[in-house]
Design a protein with these regions (language model features):
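Short, intrinsically disordered, low-complexity terminal segments
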Residues: 20, 34, 89-91
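N-terminal single-pass transmembrane signal-anchor helix
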Residues: 1-30
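Compositionally biased non-globular segments, especially hydrophobic aliphatic-rich helices
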Residues: 11, 40-43, 120-121
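Aliphatic-rich helix starts adjacent to a transmembrane/signal segment
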Residues: 29-46
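Periplasmic/extracellular, small/polar-rich flexible segments of pilin-like filament-forming proteins
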Residues: 47, 51-127
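Regular, well-ordered alpha-helical segments
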Residues: 24, 32-35, 51, 55-58
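Conserved catalytic core of two-component sensor histidine kinases
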Residues: 16, 43, 50
Length: 127
């Protein structure tokens, strides 16, 4: 009788196939998670911009289109732009460098609607 202390080739192949199947399932889910994190950063920046705009308005009785005049700074990779601002409202959009085709929009007061945002204060992103 033979003394076997290792794995057979078939057993090793089965393990490799199982690992391959698990990787094929996990990798696409990881990619979608990364995109969700980028969108969350963009939405967070637009919420922070809203707070900065309201703070600026409280001091100056007008909204601003200039980001340096507010206390706002965006997250890494996020570009925020204020397309319109006056004494009664403002409109802004933001996009992450890794998702350039999925911008998000928001507005306040008479600044909107903007992009997909149709309700004041709501942040809407391109699906």
């Amino acid at each position: 009788m033979r003394n076997s202390k290792g794995f057979t080739l078939i057993e090793l192949l089965i393990v490799v196939v199982i690992i391959g199947i698990l990787a094929a399932i996990a990798i696409p889910k990881f990619g979608a998670t990364k995109d969700k994190a980028y969108i969350a950063a963009v939405k967070s920046d637009l919420r922070n911009l809203s707070t900065a705009e309201e703070s600026y308005f409280a001091d100056n009785v007008v909204y601003t289109t200039s980001l340096p005049t507010t206390s706002f700074s965006s997250s890494a990779g996020v570009t925020v732009s204020i397309s319109a601002a006056n004494a009664t409202g403002w409109t802004a959009s933001a996009v992450h460098a890794s998702l350039p085709t999925k911008p998000c929009f928001t507005f306040a007061g008479t600044g909107g609607p903007s992009g997909l945002a149709t309700v004041e204060g709501e942040i809407k992103c391109t699906p």
